[in-house]
UniProtKB/Swiss-Prot annotation:
Domain of life: Eukaryota
Classification lineage: Eukaryota, Metazoa, Ecdysozoa, Nematoda, Chromadorea
UniProt source species: Caenorhabditis elegans
Residues annotated for Mg(2+) binding in this entry: T43, Q158
Name of the molecule in the record: DNA repair protein rad-50
Subunit structure: Component of the MRN complex composed of two heterodimers rad-50 and mre-11 associated with a single nbs-1.
Function of the molecule: Component of the MRN complex, which plays a central role in double-strand break (DSB) repair, DNA recombination, maintenance of telomere integrity and meiosis. The MRN complex is involved in the repair of DNA double-strand breaks (DSBs) via homologous recombination (HR), an error-free mechanism which primarily occurs during S and G2 phases. The complex (1) mediates the end resection of damaged DNA, which generates proper single-stranded DNA, a key initial steps in HR, and is (2) required for the recruitment of other repair factors and efficient activation of ATM and ATR upon DNA damage.
Length: 1298
């Protein structure tokens, strides 16, 4: 319990700031008396106590509260108030509040640092400073009393000592502060505002929920479109890969067939050429007449060389020409060798890359085998197809295992909670038993005390009997009282009081009617303003409603607007879906049109290019190429036919000339020439015939070569002409498709424009609705308030119609007149009452002694019963000790062991669960890494395949180079042989030449025969025809595959666009956060609803709790007041007093409020308001008792009250009565009875007065150790002295010296 020890005042009001001027007050128990004349600083003590405990000063200006600098003759005065007390926890505390005032140019009064020192039982001291904490809150916490109780109850100022009987408004304010209802009312107002804000937020959350729900649906649609497009693209890619594979196989087959056809055609051509050459050689051989050379060809060539060597100079030129050819051939061989070296270097690097590719293939195969092994796939399973499903199954299996472990862990946790609850239950039971034991021990102590009281009661009854006898003698000595006059006065007073109450009730009703009239006028103005606002809103948003539903509806607008919003959103959703479909169709058609346009441009460019190539090659149109080729082949055939016999004729005529010269006869008819002249003529004739052969043969060879080149060009042009015909046909088809596509796209664009216009209309309506939405909540609230105000106005009108009678002013005048008459009657009753006070006082004491004697007798009689109860309680304590021991030694260890075992199992299972979850995460991460590694390896292997193809090409190139080098070497040998041939002699040139020609022709014929023999079984023209037909068929198939590839490519482009649109939609912030926003909106909506519900429940609960709290506290206060009044009030006119609190519902805020009145109860049981109907003594007594009761109930652990001038405005007789009342109160609230026995908590009272009679009376009753006396010296400084019972006076500090 908090207790005040001492108070030190320095530099406050008239208290000086020097050490010897400090007022040091030690608070005595039960009463501390402070006496002194008026103006010596008695009230300063109350102000200092109020200031140190609550921080409140009696004036707003600190300069007026602090000691004057002029009186102190200083420029600076330091003021402080120090309070030493024991706090609610029994700790000794010292609170110091400091102030300072300065004078001069910068005069100011400031509050300095306040400190609170707390001394703990172990001797340590902790100091709190106002710089680091809320000093007022900390101090009130240690005292355990609210601020309002200190201000209005404990340390009430002299001017406010009778506030319990003040005006109702002021009384209500102070009682609300004491009950601390203001903060609860504010809390209710805040909760009401929060509920309204939550309702508005709930509407916002509902709209947000609908919006986010639309986003979620859009996201789902976009994701479905994306997945569908990806699936279609994947399918088209597979089809494309299949087509590419078919195309590659077809191209490979075409290449093989082309090679085969060319080989067959080359073989057939070679066969025909070889056969034609053999026929020509046979004809040439038949024309040669020389005898065969009997020897080898080398011998014959040797002789020819020797013959040429005899010619000398002409063969030297031929030799130089051959050497020049040899040099050129050597240069060509060096270039070929250099190219070969480069190719070999490149092949080496490519082989290294191929080897690296093989290692990558091995790594890829090993990685795929690992994946198959880890994912339990078959050895021949297609990993690209089955890996995703296998990974899903693998992860799902591990996740199921982890979930199973988590489930087991949850079960163990549930068992652990059960075990914990069991252990907690045992501990609670032990605590309950322990509390029961403590309670029983307290009851045992009380029973022992009662037994001891019963034993002491017998001795106390003898003293009480002697006191009763003395009181009866005193009562018999008093004069008799005229009871009839007193009764008549009381009856007359009650009659006037009833009439006054009736008039007051009528006056109150009239006042209420006047208030209702004022409220009615206010409501009328409010309704007028509200209707104008609603009309203005209707006029503002008339165009919006016209655009939405055609006309403005009646109020309320919220349901109609919500329905319209819902309909517009649904329409917008449907139109957006239709618009999206049309846009997709338009994009698809535009893509196809773009592809057709590109295809048309490509075909047109090919057509122009082929036409130009054909014209450049043939100088004719494509249709004339076949005819021109046919004519050219006829000419070529004729030229080849004319060229064949010329070579044979030349050789034959040369042999005839040689034979005629050597044999001297005609080689045809063997006729001998007679003279040499005939031989020469014959030879000359043959030479003339052979002179024209070389020129003609050369011309024919040139012609044949030219025609063959033209044939090659025209054959190529014929293929181009066929390709041109195909392109022209395909171009017509493309243009026809493009035309149909343009028509379809025009229709779709028309639909698109129509849908966009409809969507714009819906968006415009939505904008109108959103504009309405901004103020519809305000309009709805205004509408609801208007309806409530109209109902209230109608109610007030009906009530005002039924009310009649006098006005409030007339009734008030009657009340004042009747009150004046009542006061006169009360004054007469007080004069009579004064006579009966002494008798009532003696009778009251006599009754108290009788009651005390009866209680002592009952205590003595009940001592035996208390002894039996004591034995029962001791047995119950022993049973509690046994039960506590059993639970502590048996039940609690078992429960703790079970809980610890389950805790260990839960910990291990938690570790196992975390390990399983970590394994799932690691497996997912490892599989993702392996899949990524496999993709990179697969890509590198594909790149390695390109290196293999390049290696094959380079190897083919180097083979070609080797063949060219071999040919170069053969040519070199031939040139060298030719060169050597020029070193031979030139004898017998003609014969040897003919013989050499013959030998060559015969060798050629033999070689041609062998060549023709190799063609047996290889010449098959039907096979060539069949292969050409198959070749054309494959080309058609490849063309169809190409068209299919273009079609698939167009579709893939369209799907890619749709996919990009879906991805763009999904990449937006709305779609990315759609689920979380929707979930948050639902959560916010649910939380808001629950918050509204909880706040409503809490408000209702708080209302009920406040009502219950108020009723309980007020009941306790009235009980204490009734008890004190009956004990200290000596008259019989007022049986008791009480505080009446009437609950009133305030219409504006719909909250419960209280109106307070102090009522006095007469002997008849009638309750009358005490304010204005009681005497000054009754008023002071009632105020004092009310403050004591409030201090008892709301003072908590601080049983303290200070009375400043309690005898103010009291006459001499009333002062004596007040002294008796205070003495009785002090006696009633003593902590110990007359025998020194503990009775309850001790009460501290501080009485500050200038009335010596009151001081003497209280001194006789309480017998304090000393009395504090205040005075002032010649300098106006207040000083404090102690006056002891023997009359000696001692100054608290030494006297001031100058």
């Amino acid at each position: 319990m908090a207790k005040f020890l001492r108070l030190h005042i320095r530099g406050i009001r008239s208290v000086g700031d020097e050490d010897h001027d400090v007022h040091k007050i030690d608070f005595l128990s039960p009463c501390t008396l402070i006496s002194g004349p008026n103006g010596t600083g008695k009230t300063t003590t109350i102000e200092a106590l109020n200031f140190v405990t609550t921080g409140q000063m009696p004036t707003q200006k600190k300069q007026n509260f602090i000691h004057s600098t002029d009186v102190a003759r200083k420029t600076r005065v330091d003021a402080s108030v120090t309070l030493e007390f024991i706090d609610v926890k029994g700790r000794e505390c010292t609170a110091v509040r400091r102030l300072v005032v300065t004078s001069g140019t910068k005069a100011a009064a400031l509050a300095e640092e306040h400190t609170l020192a707390i001394k703990y039982p172990d001797g340590t001291v902790n100091t709190l400073s106002s710089k680091v904490c809320d000093f007022n809150t900390a101090l009130l916490k240690h005292l355990g009393v609210p601020r309002a109780v200190f201000k209005y109850v404990i340390f009430c100022h002299q001017e406010d000592s009778t506030w319990p009987l003040s005006e109702p408004k002021e009384l209500k304010k102070r009682f609300d502060d004491i009950f601390q209802l203001t903060k609860f009312v504010k809390a209710q107002e805040r909760m009401k505002k929060i509920v309204l804000d939550f309702k508005k937020e709930m509407q916002t959350h509902e709209m947000s929920k609908q919006l986010y729900e639309t986003h979620v649906r859009d996201k789902l649609v976009a994701r479905q479109n994306q997945e569908e497009c990806e699936r279609k693209i994947s399918k088209r890619k597979e089809e494309t890969d299949e087509l590419k594979e078919r195309k590659a196989n077809g191209q490979k087959k075409i290449e093989e067939m082309r090679t085969s056809i060319h080989e067959l055609e080359d073989t057939l051509t070679s066969f025909k050429k070889t056969e034609l050459e053999r026929q020509n050689l046979k004809k040439q051989l038949s024309l040669i007449r020389v005898e065969p050379y009997f020897g080898t060809e080398e011998e014959l060539k040797r002789e020819i060389e020797e013959f040429r060597g005899s010619e000398g100079r002409s063969y030297g030129e031929e030799r130089a020409r051959i050497q020049k050819k040899i040099g050129k051939n050597n240069q060509e061989r060096q270039e070929l060798s250099q190219k070969k070296t480069e190719f070999e270097n490149r092949i080496s690097s490519l082989k290294a890359e191929v080897i690296h590719c093989q290692s990558l293939k091995y790594d890829l195969e090993r990685l795929e085998n690992q994946l198959r092994s880890e994912l339990d796939l078959e050895h021949d399973a297609d990993i690209d197809i089955e890996i995703d499903n296998a990974i899903t199954l693998k992860i799902r299996g591990m996740s199921d295992k982890a979930r199973m472990i988590a489930k087991n862990c949850a079960e163990l946790q549930s068992n652990l909670r059960t075990a914990q609850e069991a252990a907690t239950k045992i501990e609670v039971e032990m605590k309950t038993l322990q509390n029961e034991k403590v309670k029983l021990e307290k009851e045992v102590e009380q029973l022992k005390f009662k037994i001891k009281q019963g034993q002491n009661a017998t001795a106390g009854m003898k003293d009480l009997l002697k006191k009763e006898e003395a009181l009866r003698k005193s009562l018999a000595d008093l004069p008799l009282l005229d009871e009839n006059a007193l009764t008549e006065c009381k009856l007359k007073r009650e009659k006037y009081l009833k009439q006054l109450d009736i008039l007051k009730k009528k006056c109150a009703e009239a006042e209420k009617n006047a208030e209702k009239d004022r409220e009615k006028e206010s409501l009328k103005q409010t309704l007028s303003i509200a209707r104008k606002k609603m009309t203005a809103y209707q006029r503002i948003y008339d165009n919006n409603w016209q655009g939405l539903i055609g006309q403005a509806p009646d109020f309320p607008w919220t349901p109609i607007l919500s329905k319209t919003f819902h309909k517009l959103r649904n329409d917008k959703k449907i139109m957006e879906e239709d618009l999206r479909d049309v846009q997709l169709n338009v994009q698809k058609l535009e893509t196809m049109q773009h592809q057709y346009r590109k295809q048309e441009e490509s075909l047109t460019a090919q057509e122009l290019k082929l036409s130009e190539n054909i014209f450049e090659a043939c100088s004719c149109e494509a249709e004339e190429v076949s005819e021109k080729l046919e004519n050219l082949r006829k000419r070529l055939k004729k030229a080849r036919k004319d060229l064949a016999p010329l070579s044979a004729k030349s050789n034959l005529y040369d042999s005839y000339i040689e034979e005629s010269k050597s044999s001297g006869c005609c080689p045809l008819c063997d006729r001998d020439f007679k003279t040499k002249k005939e031989i020469n003529e014959f030879s000359k004739k043959l030479e003339n015939m052979t002179l024209s052969f070389p020129t003609e043969q050369e011309e024919l060879e040139k012609l044949v070569s030219k025609l063959e080149k033209e044939e090659i060009i025209i054959v190529k042009a014929e293929g181009q002409a066929n390709e041109l015909q195909r392109i022209v046909k395909e171009l017509k088809e493309v243009r026809e498709k493009n035309r149909k596509l343009s028509t379809e796209m025009a229709e779709e664009k028309s639909n698109l424009s129509k849908n966009e216009k409809q969507l714009e209309t819906v968006n415009a309506k939505l904008k109108l609705a959103e504009d309405l939405q901004t103020d519809v909540g305000v309009i709805q609230q205004l509408y609801e308030q208007t309806e409530e105000n109209e109902k209230r106005y109608e109610q007030l009108v009906s009530e005002s119609d039924s009310s009649d009678g006098l006005s409030y002013t007339e009734l008030r005048k009657k009340v004042e007149d009747k009150d004046e008459e009542y006061r006169k009657i009360v004054q007469e009753g007080e004069e009579l009452q004064k006579c009966s006070e002494e008798r009532n006082k003696l009778q009251s004491k006599l009754n108290e002694l009788g009651t005390h004697r009866v209680s002592l007798g009952e205590a003595a009689a009940q001592a035996g019963a208390f002894a039996e109860q004591l034995e029962t309680k001791i047995k119950e304590i022993q049973e509690c000790i046994t039960a506590i021991s059993q639970k502590r030694n048996e039940d609690l260890p078992d429960a703790q062991f079970k809980k610890d075992d389950l805790t260990r199992n839960v910990s291990s299972k938690e570790e196992e669960k975390k390990k399983a979850e970590m394994e799932v995460q690691m497996m997912k991460k490892e599989l993702d890494q392996k899949i990524f590694h496999r993709k990179s390896l697969f890509k590198k292997v594909q790149e390695g395949g390109l290196c293999e193809r390049q290696l094959m090409d380079k190897e083919n190139n180097i083979a070609t180079l080797n063949a060219s080098l071999e040919e170069n070497q053969q040519r070199q040998k031939r040139f060298e042989e030719d060169l050597r041939s020029f070193d031979s002699s030139h004898q017998r040139e003609s014969i040897l030449k003919d013989q050499l020609t013959r030998m060559i022709i015969e060798n050629k014929i033999k070689e041609l025969k062998r060549t023709l023999a190799t063609f047996d079984g290889q010449i098959n023209e039907d096979r060539i025809t069949e292969q050409k037909q198959a070749y054309n068929k494959l080309q058609n198939e490849l063309r169809l595959i190409g068209n299919e590839e273009v079609k698939i490519y167009t579709q893939m482009q369209e799907y890619e666009k749709q996919k990009k649109i879906a991805e763009a939609k999904l990449s937006t912030k709305e779609c990315q956060n759609a689920e979380s926003n929707y979930r948050d909106a639902i959560i916010e909506l649910a939380i808001t609803k629950e918050s509204i519900s909880d706040l409503t429940k809490y408000r209702n609960c708080l209302d009920a709790s406040l009502i219950q709290f108020h009723s309980e506290k007020m009941g306790r206060v009235n009980g204490i007041i009734d008890d004190l009044w009956r004990k200290v009030y000596n008259s019989t006119d007022i049986t008791t007093i009480r505080i009446r609190s009437d609950a009133t519902s305030e219409t504006s805020s719909k909250k419960v409020a209280y109106e307070y009145n102090v009522m006095m109860v007469h002997e008849t049981g009638t309750e009358v308001e005490m304010r204005g109907r009681c005497s000054a003594g009754q008023k002071m007594l009632a105020s004092l008792l009310i403050r004591i009761a409030l201090a008892e109930v709301f003072g908590g652990s601080c049983s303290m009250i200070a009375l400043d001038e309690p005898t103010t405005n009291l006459d001499e007789s009333k002062v004596e009565g007040m002294a008796i009342v205070l003495a009785d109160i002090i006696a009633e609230r003593r902590g110990f009875d007359e025998n020194g026995k503990l009775r309850g908590r001790d009460m501290q009272m501080v009485v500050i007065t200038h009335d010596e009679r009151l001081v003497n009376r209280i001194t006789i009753s309480c017998r304090p150790e000393y009395i504090y006396c205040l005075g002032k010296d010649e300098h106006g400084i207040s000083f404090l002295s102690k006056r002891y019972p023997d009359g000696t006076v001692k100054r608290v500090n030494t006297k001031r010296r100058f």
